Each structure stands twice: as structure tokens, then as C-alpha cells.
Design a protein with these regions (language model features):
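Mixed-charge, low-complexity intrinsically disordered regions
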Residues: 2-81, 96-103, 147, 151, ...
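Amphipathic alpha-helical interface surfaces
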Residues: 23, 39, 93, 123, ...
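A short, structured beta-strand/loop element
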Residues: 39-48, 110, 115-121
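Generic alpha-helix structural propensity
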Residues: 55, 69, 92, 134-137
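Intrinsic-disorder signal
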Residues: 80-119, 138-155
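Local cysteine-cluster metal-coordination motifs and their immediate loop/turn environment
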Residues: 119-134
Length: 155
């Protein structure tokens, strides 16, 4: 069999996605199952063990009734527009941008200052000027610089 005989692949665009249950994922590519020839989305979790996964591309892209609402299983997000308001999102964004840069031959930690460290001194009382506000502001600037480097490497 040659490539002309294969069914269409219907690729999932690479990028940053959020699952309807809240987890962040990075789509790396669309691959083909050697047994069924079905298009499979190759993605990695941006939390926990950071494992690689495959799922049928049609299932990855489906809209269904999940948790009582009709919604997409996975929703794409522009890394430049992701709100920085919680640690899981911040960690996912950093991992996604590092991976994206690495695939373009850039070591972000060598090319830029490293992303800001997570605060360790928050009292949890919601203070004005909380250390988390400073963290998310610094991360916003790191994100801008990282995206600028990645986009420049794509040109």
C-alpha cells in the first residue's frame, strides 16, 4: 500500500488544548494506526506524569454531551490568550511553550531568563499585592518573550 491508497487523515492541529474536565494537554501530531489506518491524535498531558497518549482523531474533535452540557471534548487555546489565574494553567503553559520551542530547536531556559519560580510564602488571605499576583505578572512577561522567540524561529 502506498500513501495514495490511504484514507484521509483529518489532522488535529497541534497546540494547547483543555479537556472538558479541566486538564491541559498539548497536541503534538496526528498519526495513523498501522492496524486500522485510522487517524489518531498524539498528545501529552501537561500535568501529573506528563504521559503521551493517542486517541482517535474523530473522538478528540467531537462535540458531545459531557457533564450534562453539549460541549467539545477538547477545546483549543491560544497560548498568548490563556488567562493566568491558577497554578495548573501556569504550569501547563510553561510546559507547552518549552516543548514548542524545543521542537523548533530552541532551549527557552538558555535563550531567556527562566520562568518565575512558584511562590512559597502566600498566607492564603487574599492580600492586595499577593505574591501570586506578582508571579502571574512575571509569567505574563515570560510568555510574551517565549512566544516572540518561538514565532521568530518559525519564520
Amino acid at each position: 500500500m502506498n500513501d495514495d491508497d490511504l484514507p484521509p487523515l483529518h489532522p488535529t492541529p497541534p497546540g494547547l488544548y483543555r479537556h472538558y474536565k479541566g486538564g491541559w494537554y498539548e497536541v503534538l501530531d496526528t498519526v495513523r494506526c498501522s492496524e486500522t489506518l485510522q487517524g489518531m491524535t498524539l498528545y501529552r498531558a501537561l500535568y501529573g506524569g506528563w504521559g503521551l497518549w493517542v486517541r482517535p482523531a474523530a473522538m478528540f474533535a467531537e462535540v458531545g454531551v459531557f457533564e450534562g452540557c453539549e460541549q467539545p471534548r477538547f477545546t483549543p487555546h491560544d497560548p498568548a490568550q490563556v488567562p493566568l489565574a491558577d497554578l495548573a494553567t501556569a504550569q501547563a503553559l510553561i510546559a507547552h511553550l518549552r516543548g514548542l520551542a524545543q521542537r523548533r530547536g530552541i532551549d527557552l531556559d538558555a535563550a531567556l531568563r527562566p520562568p518565575p519560580p512558584e511562590p512559597e510564602t502566600c498566607c492564603g488571605r487574599g492580600c492586595n499585592g499577593c505574591v501570586w499576583e506578582g508571579y502571574y505578572t512575571a509569567l505574563h512577561h515570560w510568555r510574551e518573550d517565549a512566544l516572540e522567540r518561538v514565532l521568530a524561529a518559525s519564520r
